[in-house]
Amino acid sequence: MRMNYQMAWPYFPEHEIDWLLKEFKNILQGNASLSMGPRVKEFEDIFANYVGAEYAVGTNSCTAALEIALRSIGVQDGDEVIIPVETFIATGSAVVSEGATPVFCDIDPKTFCISLKELKKQVTKKTKAVIIVHMAGMISPDALKIKAFCQQENIILIEDAAHAIGASIQGIRAGNIGDISCFSFYPTKILTTAEGGMLLCSDKELYEKANSLRNRGRDMSTQGEVYSRLGTNNRMTEFAALLGISQLKCLNDFLRTRRTIASIYNEKIQASNISHLAQPVIVPEEINHAYWRYLITLDPSIDRELIKDELDKDNIASDWAYYPALHLQPYFVQKYGISKGLCPVAEDSLERNFCLPINSTMNKEDALFVVECFIKAVQGQL
């Protein structure tokens, strides 16, 4: 029997599986489109309504959504896009693929999100956009200040909300902060469509461009094969959309489970004698964390490899977030001649962060077992 101590586990309740099988059969036996049909539109509408945006464009990945977002705002050769370095490769590769230059920005060690102070230092006349990443499902407490700063400087703000479905700040949901936002529905994410992504915005012109670009540049307002711009094939399938519709029905339960697990982890770690050696992210009252990952910062004296080895003995998965930092990935080192020391806070953070398992199949007993094993593993290094 599968143990529940996995870093991520796509979960579909039994009643949703029954519903999905019925709907899949209807598609396969009917005359409906297999791609970009009514279910995609339904998923887009429901998702946009959940987040609070006007428009949604379903794609086949978050990477595609990021590329389309940059193309929609007219990013081109010579432009600069500021990005945090504690993030997945796609945040940077999307910028390069659209011909712009990524400007690597350090993070706030307390949140693992982009530092507003460092961001301001990076702005030049060439800055076209800023991408903020809601790291591990945490919206930066400075997110609204970053939005105001970008508006003041006439810079487009893009949210990489791949981790953060259901997160919010001051009641504003992730995906409804920037000019454009992008979500991931990869199997490891809180909500999955196997492969898939979503672009959200509330500007009609941006929406029309994005809607066209994900469909090879086709003019979606006219009949026939009319192409008014150069796009790519990044369409979402009806099957992916059905998975998304099903998952959205369960999302509140998924989030409740994750927050319960995180609360247990927080309570037990803070009450233990290792609290000075393992510091979970502190979440301000105005923020609802989605907990795609549960991040801990370890004291430099603690060897995270040894902790991982100890947890492995109890079949408990563990991990750390995005190592090495984005700017130190071999591709970017070679292309831009970057060396260690450019973003010292992130470089230190990525040497010391640690993730305990958190997924929607876990229960309180699972969480208690995991955190007790973690505390014991850290105590073993005292």
Regions found by a protein language model. Give the residues of each.
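Conserved PLP-anchoring active-site segment centered on the Schiff-base-forming lysine
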Residues: 67-122, 129-131
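PLP-dependent aminotransferase class I/II
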Residues: 38-45, 50-56, 117, 129-133, ...
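Active-site phosphate-binding strand-loop segment of PLP-dependent enzymes
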Residues: 110-193, 198-200, 204-205
